[in-house]
Swiss-Prot record:
SMART domains: HAT (SM00386). Keywords: mRNA processing, mRNA splicing, Nucleus, Repeat, Spliceosome. GO terms for biological process: generation of catalytic spliceosome for first transesterification step; mRNA cis splicing, via spliceosome; mRNA splicing, via spliceosome. Its main location: nucleus. Residues 775-790 have a biased composition (Polar residues). The gene is cwf3. This is Pre-mRNA-splicing factor cwf3. Belongs to the crooked-neck family. It is found in: Nucleus. Residues 769-790 are annotated as: Disordered.
Length: 790
């Protein structure tokens, strides 16, 4: 295999064994199957014999793809391990075979690819280039992809101008390959051509990156290229391209503005760079982008100053210029918050808070402050304002007030009262601020007149405060905010008569709040108009429903009782009955207790107890225990302890199960003190049905101590234990009680560490078996009881 086989065929290689194949081919020399069988039979023969057969077959069947492909693979395999430089003739012979095959098989891409792969191993760039061109001309466009892939890879391996020319042709066929082309241009240092190709990409309306890069990334790559190699991109209108990108990516333009400025820095145009930085900061729309530009600007100025200092010759002019520039840079740094404020206002010009913040930044310059206020009032849309637009006007007026220019302040307030604010309360605040200004300068009458004019309206107004279709100015007289201020103002500087008229006007407009009712009543009370004060409370409870009415009744009744005490008994009782008539159970407890206390102090004890008994039926279930506690005390004080039995009995009937236990314990304790042991035992028995022995241990402990002291083991103690087992069985089978018990145990017992639990069990000692009760005080007596029970 190491020797080169000449193409000249020796027909003496045909031997007797080949006679059947030869005879068959004589009969039909164009039989493909016959030739293939013949060739296959001699796969193990010498190369000369196989070449002879392939050449004869190709001569008879020059258009057979199968024969040519096998033949070419044979010839390529024979020389592929050889050095093409030292065996050029052998490679040329194989090349000739490929050329002959392509005469009729020029539409077969596999043959072309096999040929091109073979050629690319040979040092003949021109022939390879021509063969690629021939393949592209011969094959249809749909089959060009594989050829171009081979062509471009080969071109990249060769490099230089050859690669450039190949890619220039390729990107006309496949525009998305332009990114690879740009990378090659950059590797070769052809920066101007790379920039021109970037410009071509950026000018396209739509570009889909083969490398999955966003358009913004491509802009940044172009920017970096231009900034790093400004001297090689002179044929491109760099500023125009950058500004197109800034316009296109307005939300991410910070880096593009910075790159444009750096481009001017690289070409030495420092003033143009500064103006670019300024323009960027004045047009950017986000704080993030502003920060990028500002930081780059400051870095540039610091580097420029450092360079000036190093290059300074030490003369006075240079020192003065450097000092001036340093002061200018410090001023720029100090103005950073103001620049950020500019950005935020560009984002939303209706942001009132930012306008006010801008005033604070410029508070040392009166002219600029006035200009800011003027611009804000001119540009902010009242219906779109973010924040309180009224505050803007008030602060503007306050600015002139600080300079004692009250006339100008009044002009601003006058204009502010005609602005169509989003809410009525905002307009009300403007009027209040105006009045406050007048008060600060002792113009009390002017302040009263202002607010009076603001709330002036027809005697009978049917306008709804919540009607958004009407302007705030039309609805202002229904604003409780401005009326509350007006009332406070009138109380401070007016008379009782004028103040009463205003309060009455508030009631006429039907905008009275609970606070207005209380304030009006207190005002009248302070001026000794007690009956009028009580009338206001009556108007208040008629206006408002519960729970507001409950608070008003509480105040009304308390003040009425305090005023008249026991002198108007029937009237006071009527008021209490009126208060309780429509009072929901959840609010009636306080009124009943107040009523009972009144009767006890100024009326009859019997009537007080009767009220408490009625309260026990009327209040909500959760409040009944408190009522019964008071009732028990009152009955015991007035009628003796024996009289409390009926109260206890009624309480046990009406209280909830959880509250009955405590009531039974108290009842039994009372009977025990009276010596009524049997009655006490019956009470314990009655209460036991509500007490789970595993949960309500206090109840059963109290009963056990009672039986130990007053009972006998043979009967009462045994009966108690029987009842206890019965009750426990009942609770064990009641799913509702099981759930309650589990919840109670979970809430009462925190999770315990296993080691702590083990230590606790050891410290507690042995536990009693189920059904037995361990005694803490007298083990012998307990064992006696349990033994007798068994």
């Amino acid at each position: 295999m190491g020797d080169v086989i000449p193409l000249k065929v020796n027909f003496d290689l045909i031997n007797v064994d080949d006679e059947p194949f030869e005879l068959e081919l004589l009969r039909d020399p164009y039989s493909l199957k016959s030739w293939l069988r013949y060739i296959k039979t001699h796969e193990g023969s010498t190369l000369e014999k196989r070449v002879l057969l392939f050449e004869r077959a190709c001569s008879e069947l020059p258009g057979s793809y199968k024969i040519w492909k096998s033949y070419l693979e044979l010839r390529v395999a024979h020389v592929e391990h050889l050095n093409p430089y030292f065996h050029a003739e052998a490679f040329a012979s194989v090349n000739d075979c490929f050329e002959r095959s392509l005469i009729l098989l020029h539409k077969m891409p596999v043959i072309w690819k096999l040929y091109l792969q073979f050629l690319m191993k040979q040092p003949n760039v021109t022939k390879i280039r021509c063969t690629f061109n021939s393949a592209l001309r011969a094959l249809p466009v749909t089959q060009h992809d594989d050829i171009w892939d081979m062509f471009t890879k080969y071109a990249e391996d060769i490099g230089g101008l050859f690669c450039i020319h190949v890619y220039r042709r390729y990107i006309q066929v496949e525009p998305r390959a332009i990114e690879n082309y740009i990378e090659i241009l950059c590797k070769l240092g052809l920066w101007n051509e790379a920039a021109r190709q970037y410009e071509d990409i950026l000018n396209r309306p739509v570009f889909l990156s083969a490398k999955r890069k966003s358009n913004y990334q491509i802009w940044l790559e172009f920017s970096e290229l231009v900034v790093q190699h400004p001297d090689h991109t002179q044929n491109i209108d760099v500023e125009k391209v950058f500004r197109a990108g800034i316009k296109r990516f307005s939300d991410q333009a910070g880096k593009l503005w910075t790159y444009l400025a750096q481009y001017y820095i690289r070409i030495g145009d420092y003033e143009k760079a500064r103006s670019t930085f300024y323009e960027g900061m004045n047009n950017i729309m986000t704080v993030r982008n502003f920060t990028i530009i500002f930081d780059a600007f400051v870095e540039f100025e610091e580097q420029w100053l450092s360079a000036r200092v190093e290059a300074s010759s030490g003369n006075a002019n240079d020192e003065l210029s450097i000092d001036f520039h340093m002061a200018w840079l410090e001023k720029i740094l100090d103005k950073r918050p103001l620049y950020i404020n500019d950005v935020l206002l560009r984002q939303n010009i209706n942001n009132v808070d930012e306008w006010l913040r801008r005033v604070k930044f410029l508070e040392d310059d009166s002219e600029k402050v006035v200009q800011v206020y003027t611009d804000a009032i001119k540009n902010v849309n009242p219906k779109l304002a973010h924040g309180s637009l009224g505050k803007l006007f008030s602060e503007f007026a306050r600015f002139y007030e600080n300079f004692d220019d009250l006339e100008q302040s009044r002009i601003i307030f006058e204009k502010a009262t005609h602005v169509p604010y989003k809410t009525v309360n905002e307009l009300a605040q403007v009027w209040i601020d105006w009045a406050e200004m007048e008060l600060r300068h002792q113009n009390f009458d002017a302040a009263r007149k202002l607010i009076g004019d603001a709330v002036h309206a027809p005697r009978k107004s049917h306008i709804s405060f919540f009607d958004e279709s009407l302007s705030p100015q039309v609805r202002l007289h229904k604003s409780s905010k401005i009326w509350m201020y007006y009332l406070d103002l009138e109380e401070s500087v007016g008379t009782i008569e004028t103040t009463r008229k205003l309060y009455d006007r508030v009631f006429e407009l039907k905008i009275a709040t609970p606070q207005v009712v209380v304030n009006y009543a207190n005002l009248l009370e302070e001026n000794a108009y007690f009956e009028d004060s009580f009338k206001i409370y009556e108007r208040g409870v008629a206006l408002f429903s519960y729970p507001v009415a409950f608070e008003l009744w509480n105040l009304y009744l308390t003040k009425f009782v305090k005023r008249y005490q026991g002198t108007h008994m029937e009237r006071t009782r009527d008021l209490f009955e009126q208060a309780l008539e429509g009072c929901p159970p959840e609010f009636s407890k306080s009124i009943y207790l107040l009523y009972a206390d009144f009767e006890e102090k100024f009326g009859k004890a019997k009537r007080s107890i009767s009220i408490l008994e009625k309260a026990a039926d009327k209040v909500k279930t959760a409040d009944r225990l408190a009522i019964y506690n008071v009732l028990l005390v009152k009955v015991a004080l007035n009628y003796g302890v024996l009289a409390t039995r009926t109260v206890y009995e009624k309480a046990i009937e009406s209280l909830s199960d959880s509250e009955v236990k405590d009531m039974c314990l108290r009842f039994a304790e009372m009977e025990t003190k009276l010596g009524e042991i049997d009655r006490a035992r019956l009470i314990y028995i009655h209460g036991s049905q509500y007490c789970d022995p595993r949960v309500e241990t206090d109840y059963w402990k109290a009963w056990q101590e009672f039986e130990i002291r007053y009972g006998n083991p043979e009967e009462t103690v045994k009966e108690m234990l029987r009842i206890k087992r019965s009750v426990q069985t009942k609770f064990s089978t009641d799913s509702l009680h099981i759930a309650k018990r589990a919840a109670k145990i979970e809430s009462a017992a925190a999770p315990m560490d296993p080691m702590e639990q083990l230590e606790m069990e050891k410290s507690e000692g042995p536990k009693a078996l189920a059904g037995f009760v361990l005694s803490k005080s007298n083990p012998q007596e307990t064992s006696k009881i349990t033994g007798e029970e068994n």
